[in-house]
Each structure stands twice: as C-alpha cells, then as structure tokens.
C-alpha cells in the first residue's frame, strides 16, 4: 500500500507531465501559427510589390526649353498621356497658319502621333510653340508651350510618352491591355488603367483608390467607383461633373 507521501509524489509527477504536455502542445501550435503568419506576410508582400509595380515606372522625358530642344519630339512617335485634355487645331501647311478660332478636337487617351514639325506661332494667347501632326489625311497642330516673359513654358512632357506605354507597363496582364486598347473600363481595373482607357476624369473628393471618378470619355460619359484601389462599379451615361 502506497504511503501518503508516495501518492503525493505520483500526483505531482502526473500534474507536471500534464503541464509539460500542454506547454509543448501550445508551443507547437504557436510555431505553426507563426509559420503561417510569416507565409501570409510573404504572400502579401509579393502582392503589394506587384500592385505597386507602377510606382517603379519612370517614363523618359525630353525636358525641352527652347525650339531646338523641342524638336526632339520629331525623332520618335509619341503617345498621349492625358486623354481628352488637350485641344488641337486645323493647320494650313501652305500658309503655315493655325486656325485657333475653331477647336478641331481633343487628343485621345494613348493616341499615337507622329510629330512632323515643331514651330513658334502667334495666337490669341500670345506666342506658342506648336507640334504638327497628321490625322485622317489632314494636318493639325497642338500647342506644347506658351511664352512667359522672354521664355517659353513647355508642358509637352506632361502631354506625351516618348516610349510605348505597352512596354512601360508590360507587367499589366494581357486582358487589362486588351480593355485599355479598346477604350473600355472593366471591374478590377486601377485608376491609372482607366485613365489610359478613357482619359482623365473628375473625382468626387476622396483619396486615390477610394472614390468615384466621372469621365467625360470623349462624349460618352461614365462614372467609376473605386474601392481598395480597384474599380468595383461602372455606371455608363453618368454626366461628368
């Protein structure tokens, strides 16, 4: 028959074994949780890195400051960065004159242009630098700089890409580029992708990726609501504000 002291020692040993087993089980579960959390963190980091890949795109710029440097635009095609933002006018090659009295149209989103010449002309707004291009067998001019005091303020770097956007943003999925080239906004697209598809819009306040933007879209207006950085609702026919 066991003595009381022996019983006490056995009970204490069993209790200690239970505690050790519980601690070991808890530690194993903790290790698994930490391993899973680390895996999830790595996956999120990959997702964020992919989502933020646009931040690492650095388009080349020409930084023109006079007529001679602006003629670099002739050396390669250009693509319109901000669709439906810049007015172009009819140009008479024989008379080397621009009809500033009538708008000929707006440059479309990612429209590809071949600039044939760059020159200084007089306009109702003072002297301007214009870029000459052809479209539908007609010749047009679009202002790329305005004279301020004795110098010209150039904004052509804000108007044009001088590299193919398809190469600059080649990390975008093929289905995204298919929609962009078709000038369509689809659920899941980012604001920049929508801008490339249908031009610049007017936001209803809010912060990028968490707001509604109204796009004139060259006379085919639509509104797009973004959440979490992606388009979640597209409403055709909504008037741009």
Where are these predicted regions, by residue range?
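SH3-family beta-barrel domains
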Residues: 38-97, 158-160
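Conserved beta-strand/loop element in small beta-rich adapter and peptidoglycan-binding domains
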Residues: 98-121
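Boundary regions of SH3-family modules and the immediately adjacent low-complexity/disordered segments
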Residues: 133-169
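N-terminal Lys/Arg-rich, disordered targeting/topogenic segments
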Residues: 1-8
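Hydrophobic single-pass membrane-insertion segments
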Residues: 25-37
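A cross-family detector of function-defining hotspots
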Residues: 29-32, 120-126, 170, 174-241
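Hydrophobic membrane-insertion alpha-helices, especially the h-region
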Residues: 11-28
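A short macromolecule-binding patch
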Residues: 71-73, 78-79, 136-148, 223-226
